[in-house]
Amino acid sequence: FFGLTISNDNLVIKVLQSVAEFLEEGTEMHHCVYHNGYYKNKECLILSAKDMNGKRIETIEVSLKTFNIIQSRGVCNSQTKYHKEIIDLMNENMYKIKKITSIDKQKAVA
């Protein structure tokens, strides 16, 4: 999922790519994405939604089994004014995550 970016005119959503990024996300957003070890969970994908100025807005958890959004939370687990826009943008682009997952499964079989 490295390099996966989802965006529109207001938002840029990217996959958290390292343990350090999980720590930074959890610290800045004041939630448990780092301390609960989400980076260890191979059944979910964690992304960070930011505005065009680079300000973190929400952290998104996607199930890699169902391709549903499990949760999307702002600072201190709040919902933000961008919440619906983030959910809609993720759902419109979920096919990108499915496609990458499908390619990874094919490589594992080969």
Residue ranges and their predicted role:
Residues 1-110:
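Catalytic-core elements of nucleic-acid end-processing and repair enzymes
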